[in-house]
Amino acid sequence: MLSFREVKKRVKIPGFHCHHIIPLEIIDKAAFRPLFRTMRELGFDFDDFHQNGMYLPCTEANAAAFRLPLHRGPHPVYNQLVCERIAAFDRQRRDSQLFEMQQLQSGLKAALRRNELPLRKGSRNPFTSDADFECMEIAAYRLWNLLPSH
């Protein structure tokens, strides 16, 4: 396992930040503690960069060059989307929760790589500065093949 702390210390990529696919803010929410405790018991480690992380550009130049969303800190709209998806997990079926979490992470990573889930803060994203929550909802529905891709 390579923790986020180790990645930040040993693998510095200029112009990029480490991004938690499932944000720490959500992991710390009291309502989700039982679910995340179950996830840990099933072997899911939210601090494992390979499982729960990816590099995203933190400069407009790199966002343009790599066509990825700009990451410059907190991203409350992204967090809200992830929170809503996790809240929809089937709490009665412990055996399906790990699968649902892995599917969510895979879908979020893929959508971020396609620049479909903008990480908005006060700074502007050169490709998705006009994106809003509706855009993120459409991308989320595509993750579960509920809408055709464009």
Regions found by a protein language model. Give the residues of each.
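Betabetaalpha-Me/HNH-type nuclease active-site subdomain
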Residues: 1-68, 129, 133-149
